[in-house]
Amino acid sequence: LFMVEEQIRDNLSSRLKNLGSHLIRVKLININTKKTLQIMAERIKDKKMDIEDCVFLSKHISTFLEVYDPISSSYVLEVSSGGLARPLTMIDDYEQFKYNKAKIVLKDKFLGKKTFKGFLKGVDKNGKILLETESDKIKFNFFEIEKANIDPNWAAKNN
């Protein structure tokens, strides 16, 4: 699945950019025998996405996928915004959403745990992601992160 997601991401990213949108995430989900291809995107100019944007992108993405055909079996296409709990999928996201509260889940335990919540402080000059928790200032390498999201239960401090 991961390979297919990467191929779709690589092929869709520049196409969406040409349409004024930024690709957030591509995820192929198997539930029983049904496949769903989830595409998350946002407008480049204001980082938002409304229903008209989703319909517009869905038509373009569907046309592209019919020609490109990366998934051999049938599937359902879902196009949406990143939502309030927007995933942080690229290293640039950690700088863009600086000062927002985030939840970061690591691939391996660090300081005895895998999940950390705190305020994003951006990316340092060495490419380490900075997170300020209630008790500490922590640095992570991007490749150590399994998944991360904006925490919608906290408003941005200064954005």
Locate each region found by the language model.
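Short Lys/Arg-rich amphipathic alpha-helical segments
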Residues: L1-N159
